[in-house]
Amino acid sequence: MKAFILGAGLGTRLAPLTHILPKPLVPVFQKPLIQHTMDFYIRCGIRDFIVNTSCLPLMWERAFPEPTYRGCPVYFSQEEEPLDSGGGVKKIMPQVPQDEPLLVHNGDILTDIPVAELLAAHKRNGNLVTLALRSLDGKRNVGFDEATGKVTDMRHALGVNPGTHQFAGVYLMDPCVAELFPEDDKFSIVPVWLELIKRGKVGGVVFDWAAWHEIGSPEMYLDAVLEMSSRERIHPSATIASGADLGEDCVVGQDAVIPAGCVLDDCIVWPRTHVQPGTYRRCILTPRINVQL
């Protein structure tokens, strides 16, 4: 099975950080967000990746100087302009085997939703699309019948259900779904799903117990990192003066420099950032800008 990670969005909600890096490349602890996703899927047995890109292509080249990651091939699909959630999938379909589902993962989601459980439900229920869902919080715009395991509506577009669950940003899709794609190169995947919902071919699995973080805005990014536990909060190459005061939840990246006179609390310091003396609370510090929250 191949995993397709959506990385071509403009990332407007995460601006101004996405003026520096595409959203999937923002650092989470000591590596880019997308590498956490790839590491998890490698542990799940996936060994083949596709990533669509658009903005800041040079940053992608720096992050992946070769089209591989940990020995696994990575095919990069460059879009001159973002093709939306459906157009991006359509563009990479020639790279997708026709005899197995495609796993699609939103590039701003960090989760450990198990592929095996999603795949088992996909096959068991005869779905063409199976969505990972949540019911704990967030925007509930997916109608889901837990008794049947079927999705019954989305965004109340069919007038069936105003929404009981949230789409978790991960789904499986049989390649034959591409037969329903419009001729346009740029389009949303949602109308395709709605057509399949009417045919009873879209299922869902609720993963409220799984770890799940959306890196959608600077505040969501900071909160997600602060909520996660990691032994890699301070990179060993970082220089932290004895006169600097760092809160225990701060994350400091590679080759960052924090001089005496700095007080940091609940902050993320990106790699190669030279922090100026001062007091920072709930702040994301980068080599170019600081984002105060």
Name the predicted role of every residue range.
Residues 25, 142-144, 204:
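A structural signal for short hydrophobic beta-strand segments in well-ordered beta-sheet cores
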Residues 6, 28, 52, 77-79, ...:
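Generic beta-sheet signal
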Residues 100-103, 110, 115-123, 134-137, ...:
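Catalytic-core segments of class I nucleotidyltransferases/pyrophosphorylases
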Residues 1-60:
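N-terminal glycine-rich phosphate-binding loop and ensuing alpha1 helix
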Residues 232-246, 250-252, 256-258, 262, ...:
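A structural motif detector for beta-strand N-caps
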Residues 60-146:
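Conserved beta-loop-beta/alpha segment of the NTase-like Rossmann-fold superfamily
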Residues 2, 47-49, 73, 101, ...:
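Residues at the starts of beta-strands that form the adenosine-phosphate
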Residues 35, 86, 90, 261:
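Glycine-rich phosphate-binding loop at the start of an alpha helix
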